[in-house]
Curated annotation (Swiss-Prot):
The lineage of its organism: Bacteria, Pseudomonadati, Pseudomonadota, Alphaproteobacteria, Hyphomicrobiales. GO terms for cellular component: ribonucleoprotein complex; ribosome. It holds the Pfam family Ribosomal_L31. Signal peptide: none annotated. This is Large ribosomal subunit protein bL31. Binds the 23S rRNA. GO terms for molecular function: rRNA binding; structural constituent of ribosome. The keyword ATP-binding does not apply. Belongs to the bacterial ribosomal protein bL31 family. Type A subfamily. HAMAP family: Ribosomal_bL31_1.
């Protein structure tokens, strides 16, 4: 097996949408980095039955909607 080809694996702090924090090991960032989640299991529609509204942090959702607003898939 080749040496030094894998990313560094270290502890990072994960902050969920409700402010809950926990430590986990990850290749994200550097030792002690903080990963702020936009969507987590408590707010994701797949785990909440679709009742939660998605928050548009960073404007990604609105940018997608404006870019593809005129697109239709055969429905009129």
């Amino acid at each position: 097996m080749k040496a030094d080809i894998h990313p560094q694996y270290h502890l990072v702090k994960v902050v969920m949408t409700d402010g809950t924090e926990f430590l986990t090991r990850s290749t994200y960032g550097s030792e002690g980095a903080t990963l702020n989640l936009d969507i987590d299991p408590k707010t994701h529609p797949a785990w909440t039955g679709g009742s939660a509204q998605l928050l548009d942090r960073g404007g990604r959702l609105s940018r997608f909607n404006s870019r593809f607003s005129g697109l239709s898939f055969g429905k009129k």
